[in-house]
């Protein structure tokens, strides 16, 4: 299907498919000065963690303890009292950015790492989502859908904190083919504490397409992987790199899985730039 993983046998059998990216509850991510300071995340200065995370120019900061952000959007007026609650006004329309896998797929310069990550995905029939959708469809006179699938990733930790290590047909995925955690899992929490999804989230250190090209193309530190496991008869060129990565995944006995797992981090709080080294 258009927009779904390429060169992935779990998807290639479908001419069309109804699929959701994840069936767990999306988290609303807040950045507050108090929370950042409590976790030793820098909030002021030219190279502050907050400035880098915001993607702003020099000087980005949270310098007022009352300031807060939801995703990338600033709360400009807060705690407006109403008869039945409070209003918090934000400067832009709030749009959830999607989970890690979705963002990698949508960004213009992360197509190669997204392709590699999606080698580890498969569509799983989701009876609950199918039933919920059809209940809504019947109520509002819309067509029902026979089957809705959920896009999930082979991983040592997935929804509910348990592994997702079986294919849709029930075959076991070896350790060498499992990601550290499911990059499509909206409600991720670390293995140490199921309750800390309210306090922390996962992270991934993502290489751009150019960085991956520099690594795998001739002269890069990983060009020998393509020479050993690349597609037969294809030169190691930029144009051929997607096909060569496909072959490397199929023949490389977990090399690309290890490549991704080296980037995956279990804690955002512990992975901000000021804590490197």
Language-model regions, residue ranges each:
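Mature, structured domains of secreted/extracytosolic soluble proteins
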Residues: 1-277
């Amino acid at each position: 299907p258009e927009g779904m993983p390429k060169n992935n046998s779990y998807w290639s059998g479908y001419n069309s498919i109804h699929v959701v990216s994840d069936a767990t509850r999306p988290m609303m991510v807040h950045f507050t000065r108090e929370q950042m300071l409590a976790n030793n995340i820098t909030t002021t200065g030219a190279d502050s963690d907050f400035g880098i995370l915001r993607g702003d120019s020099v000087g980005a900061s949270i310098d007022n303890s009352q300031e807060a952000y939801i995703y990338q959007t600033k709360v400009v007026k807060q705690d407006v009292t109403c008869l039945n609650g409070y209003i918090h006004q934000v400067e832009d329309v709030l749009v959830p950015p999607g989970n890690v896998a979705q963002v990698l797929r949508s960004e213009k310069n992360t197509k190669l790492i997204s392709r590699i990550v999606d080698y580890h995905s498969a569509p799983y029939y989701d009876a609950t989502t199918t039933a919920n959708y059809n209940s809504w469809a019947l109520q509002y006179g819309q067509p029902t859908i026979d089957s809705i699938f959920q896009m999930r990733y082979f991983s040592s930790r997935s929804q509910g904190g348990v592994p997702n290590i079986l294919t849709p047909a029930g075959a076991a995925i070896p350790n060498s083919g499992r990601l550290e955690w499911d990059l499509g899992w909206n409600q991720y929490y670390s293995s140490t504490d199921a309750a800390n999804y309210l306090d922390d989230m996962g992270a991934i250190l993502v290489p751009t397409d150019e960085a991956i090209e520099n690594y795998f193309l001739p002269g890069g530190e990983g060009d020998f992987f393509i020479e050993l496991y690349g597609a037969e008869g294809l030169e190691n060129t930029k144009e051929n790199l997607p096909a060569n990565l496909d072959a490397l995944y199929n023949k490389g006995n977990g090399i690309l899985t290890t490549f991704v797992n080296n980037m995956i981090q279990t804690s955002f709080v512990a992975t901000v730039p000021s804590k490197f080294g």
